[in-house]
């Protein structure tokens, strides 16, 4: 691999990871796709359009993995949720449309066929034209349009985004209410038809079915808040998949990520990722200092002092790089 060739790949790396993560909903799998794309790039001769070539290779690798993942996820214990990633300025903002990164959107993408998901991600996440998508997927332009249309019908129209400052304020109120086991405060924050999902993957204790309705979710949250294990837990707010989320630490280790979704200023969905395998990527990001700053704007938080403040924003950290991987 020449220095120029490696430089071309490194320039494409963040985009390839972003594409693969949106396609798969799994950060570790996305890293594997980037590594495999690099190995193929290493063996390829001169490429006329490196970005298009790498995008096509990564997309095809994702399509292959999605086919096997569907069967694996059908056998998954309890609800399957994507792997959370800590986000902030950096690679996540090189994509014109950030909405496709949202945790709730990644959940909805599970309804799609692999080809529909590819068409949706390429169009919504990377602003590819239908003609370009057709070329990348090896289908006609009419077929590409149809794939995208079906995907959009399944996913629905983009919801009106809750303004970031207001969203963060509600998440912080939710954190305070949870910490104090404040029943009236929690009740005011929950929508009538709120749903709570928990993904333990059979590796930790978690509800295996969604909990629906304000009364049931309220009991569920109060049970969590009063659980002896959480009495000594540490909580913080950090940007996950582009939006504020609640992070829970036990004995200094990340043990849960709670991702809220809002409708009309109230919590309508609460998605709890508890499976330690799915928390590994976010935990590694946090250990590299990607947890943002104190709420008063002072020095960045480190793993040893998460409990002392709320993380209000994040910075993208790639760490030491190896060819074909996101550090």
What do these predicted regions represent?
Residues 72-94:
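Internal acidic/polar
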Residues 26-27, 35-51, 68-71, 157-159:
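Sigma70-family region 2
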Residues 11, 86-117, 167-168, 176, ...:
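Amphipathic alpha-helical segment used for protein-protein interaction
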Residues 132-135, 141-223:
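Solvent-exposed, charged amphipathic helical/linker segments at domain boundaries
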Residues 55, 59-77:
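Arg/Lys-rich amphipathic alpha helix in sigma70-family domain 2
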Residues 112-128:
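Short amphipathic alpha helix immediately N-terminal
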Residues 1-18, 28-31, 48:
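A short, charge-rich alpha-helical start-of-domain segment used by transcription regulators
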Residues 16, 30-41, 54-57, 104, ...:
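Short, small-hydrophobic-rich alpha-helical interface motif
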């Amino acid at each position: 691999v020449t220095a120029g060739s490696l430089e071309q790949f490194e320039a494409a790396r963040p985009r390839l990871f972003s594409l693969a993560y949106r396609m798969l909903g799994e950060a570790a799998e996305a890293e594997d796709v980037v590594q495999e794309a690099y190995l193929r790039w290493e063996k390829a001769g001169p490429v006329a359009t490196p970005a298009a070539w790498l995008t096509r290779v990564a997309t095809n690798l994702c399509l292959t993995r999605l086919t096997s993942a569907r069967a694996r996820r059908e056998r998954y214990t309890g609800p399957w949720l994507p792997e959370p990633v800590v986000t902030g300025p950096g690679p996540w903002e090189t994509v014109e449309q950030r909405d496709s990164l949202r945790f709730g959107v990644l959940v909805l993408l599970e309804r799609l066929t692999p080809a529909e998901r590819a068409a949706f991600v390429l169009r919504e996440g990377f602003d590819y034209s239908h003609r370009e998508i057709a070329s990348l997927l090896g289908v006609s332009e009419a077929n590409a349009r149809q794939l995208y249309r079906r995907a959009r019908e399944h996913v629905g129209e983009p919801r009106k985004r809750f303004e970031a400052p207001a969203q963060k304020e509600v998440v912080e109120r939710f954190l305070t209410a949870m910490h104090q086991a404040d029943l009236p405060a929690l009740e005011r924050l929950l929508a009538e038809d709120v749903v709570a999902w928990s993904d333990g993957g059979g590796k930790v204790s978690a509800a295996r079915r969604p909990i629906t309705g304000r009364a049931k979710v309220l009991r569920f949250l109060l049970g969590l808040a009063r659980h002896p294990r959480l009495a000594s837990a540490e909580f913080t707010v950090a940007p996950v998949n582009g939006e504020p989320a609640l992070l829970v630490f036990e004995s200094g280790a990340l043990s849960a990520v709670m991702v809220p979704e809002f409708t009309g200023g109230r919590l309508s969905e609460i998605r709890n990722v508890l499976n330690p395998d799915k928390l590994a990527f976010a935990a590694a990001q946090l250990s590299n200092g990607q947890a943002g700053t104190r709420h008063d704007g002072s020095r960045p938080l480190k793993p040893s002092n998460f409990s002392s403040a709320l993380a209000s924003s994040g910075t993208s950290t790639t760490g030491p790089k190896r060819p074909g991987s996101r550090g």
